[in-house]
């Protein structure tokens, strides 16, 4: 299923990426990703994640695949959440390079908002990267306001 | 090492957004940013619920959730393992969070969106630090109990002061010396109740004495209308409530309004209501260019200072009503040492201009004209508060509440403008007019 071009561009821009998963007992877990590649035609998003920092999240995806991802622009809180099923792959060279670029641009974006590099460093970690390949099933508006939580696209 | 919630106080300041993850009964997770997480006690946190409706739905079916908190000083991340307990839509905690949300969201012009629907209480089962490649910084936190000692030191100073002016000074000097808070102002409510007027400040280029804030407007006005402290730890996204930072006396002369002082680069602000006998008397306001300059403990200590100052001020005003009754002896004053000066009074708003410089308006303006007229007529320079209060000429039924405050405002404003007429407080309930040169009094018609 095709992902809207504007949305794809938004997801690949310097936005904060947060991940939600759960274990077998339905206990949720939180993590951050350091970069996204959108494969529009396939309806897929690849996410670079540090397994060293977020081991429980990667284990949850390996176990059940259910994954929710919110992309939020720090300057104005414009946000979208995508949900679907994901698999874990080892990070290809392109994903390692992607994470590098993302960390650079994110640190400078947050720097413009007055956050020092030493403060944002713990959120932008590239140690032991893996790739989560998310097959998107639902897309929601998440920007704070009346439309928050509204479903904008659903793929069978 | 076990991490206690209270060790994470900085994470609850709302500087870096927190995150919550939940899961629906079918297992699908949900991940969302949170605007406010509040520390309730060592075992519970409260989350504001404005619009993250999927989160609210999920925890009602599956109460297990994860919350990620971030320390704004070093970026350190902490994962809380939480269980949803209940939703509150009233009570002290709800009110406190609603006010905080309103005060900060009216600043950014999204008051409507940020209406608080409920406060969700979660029990915290565990706290873990998220691995970080950068070493955690040893951030020096102020020693607990220090604020209490500082508040006691200010209270001592205030207790020694006996009139409105010295009480205001005792509070502001005390904040600077005992707390090391360098930018502060004290505003008192007008008896009409719609406005707060600055009667003293420290740390600003201009004192701003006589400047006004509407009750309900901005952080200061919200603390007044809600009668609760309002604190902001990161102003970087909040528009300044006063754009009048570059005020000049030309501007004052044109608008007959004195601009509120303020720091152009303020990052933290706190406003404390001053209440005595159940009546709001004013607001104590502090600001800093540092993020997180005022902790929750600071806020509590400052709230005590503000309330004690309110009680002292109420007492000082009440005592004045029983001040000396004897009208001072008519002194033969020949104070024609300086050059003459012109005092123009505009009756419609009681504004006063001395040699074309705006001084003040309203009741303090009327008071000055009254004193100068008697001075011209009788040559008298000594006055009692009692005779002013009883004066038929002033026709001020409401003035008895805060005559001292208005006289203080007039006195400080005359001082600040280095006017050729000055007001001195000689003893309790008595004032003296010092006039350098002959005053030419004029009534302006327009």
Residue ranges and their predicted role:
Chain B
Residues 27, 132-165, 281:
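Signal-transmission linkers at sensory-effector interfaces
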Residues 161-199, 316:
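Helix-loop-beta substructure at the N-terminus of cytosolic sensory domains
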Residues 199, 206-262:
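Regulatory sensory and allosteric helical modules in signal-transduction proteins
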Residues 207, 264, 281, 287-303, ...:
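Regulatory loop-to-helix N-cap segments in sensory/regulatory domains
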Residues 323, 359-360, 374-375, 404-446:
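DNA-binding patch around the recognition helix
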Residues 357-390, 410:
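Short amphipathic alpha-helical recognition elements used for nucleic-acid or partner binding
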């Amino acid at each position: 299923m095709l992902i809207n071009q504007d949305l794809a561009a938004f997801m690949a821009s310097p936005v904060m990426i947060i991940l939600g998963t759960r274990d077998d007992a339905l206990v949720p877990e939180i993590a951050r990703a350091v970069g996204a590649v959108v494969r529009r035609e396939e309806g897929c998003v690849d996410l670079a994640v540090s397994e060293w920092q977020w081991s429980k999240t990667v284990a949850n995806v390996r176990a059940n695949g259910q994954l929710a991802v919110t992309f939020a622009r720090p300057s104005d809180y414009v946000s979208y959440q995508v949900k679907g099923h994901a698999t874990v792959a080892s990070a290809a060279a392109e994903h390692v390079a992607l994470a590098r670029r993302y960390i650079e641009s994110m640190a400078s974006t947050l720097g413009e908002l007055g956050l020092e590099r030493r403060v944002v460093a713990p959120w932008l970690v590239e140690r032991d990267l893996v790739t989560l390949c998310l097959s998107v099933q639902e897309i929601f508006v998440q920007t704070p306001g009346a439309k928050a939580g509204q479903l904008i696209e659903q793929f069978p | 090492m076990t991490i206690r919630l209270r060790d994470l106080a900085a994470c609850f300041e709302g500087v870096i957004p927190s995150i919550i993850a939940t899961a629906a009964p079918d297992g699908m997770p949900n991940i969302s940013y949170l605007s406010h997480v509040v520390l309730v006690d060592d075992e519970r946190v409260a989350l504001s619920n404005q619009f993250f409706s999927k989160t609210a739905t999920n925890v009602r079916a599956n109460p297990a959730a994860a919350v990620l908190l971030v320390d704004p000083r070093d970026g350190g991340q902490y994962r809380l393992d939480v269980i949803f307990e209940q939703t509150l839509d009233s009570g002290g905690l709800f009110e406190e969070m609603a006010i905080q949300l309103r005060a900060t969201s009216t600043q950014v012009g999204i008051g409507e969106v940020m209406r608080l629907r409920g406060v969700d209480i979660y029990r915290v089962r565990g706290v873990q630090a998220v691995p970080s490649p950068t070493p955690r910084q040893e951030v020096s936190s102020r020693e607990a109990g220090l604020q209490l000692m500082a508040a006691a030191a200010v209270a001592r100073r205030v207790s020694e002061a006996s009139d409105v002016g010295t009480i205001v000074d005792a509070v502001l000097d005390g904040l600077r010396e005992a707390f090391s808070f360098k930018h502060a102002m004290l505003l008192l409510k007008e008896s009409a109740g719609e406005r707060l007027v600055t009667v003293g400040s420290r740390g600003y280029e201009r004192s701003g004495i006589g400047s006004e804030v509407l009750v309900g407007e901005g952080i200061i006005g919200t603390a007044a209308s809600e009668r609760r402290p309002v604190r902001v730890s990161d102003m970087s996204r909040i528009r300044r409530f006063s754009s009048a930072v570059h005020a000049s006396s030309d501007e004052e002369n044109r608008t007959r309004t004195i601009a509120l002082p303020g720091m152009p680069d303020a990052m933290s602000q706190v406003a404390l209501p001053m209440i005595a006998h159940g009546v709001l008397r004013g607001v104590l306001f502090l600001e800093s260019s540092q993020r997180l300059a005022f902790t929750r403990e600071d806020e509590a200590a400052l709230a005590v200072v503000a309330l004690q100052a309110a009680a002292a001020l109420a007492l000082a005003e009440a005592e004045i009503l029983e001040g000396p009754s004897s009208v001072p002896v008519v002194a033969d004053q020949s104070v024609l040492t300086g050059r003459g000066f012109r005092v123009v009074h505009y009756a419609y708003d009681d504004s006063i201009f001395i040699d074309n410089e705006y001084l003040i308006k309203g009741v303090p303006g009327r008071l000055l004209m009254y004193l100068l007229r008697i001075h011209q007529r009788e040559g008298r320079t000594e006055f009692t508060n009692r005779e002013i209060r009883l004066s038929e000429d002033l026709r001020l039924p409401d003035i008895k509440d805060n005559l001292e405050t208005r006289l203080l405002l007039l006195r400080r404003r005359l001082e600040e403008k280095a006017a050729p007429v000055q007001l001195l407080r000689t003893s309790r309930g008595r004032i003296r007019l010092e006039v350098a040169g002959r005053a030419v009094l004029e009534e302006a018609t327009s």
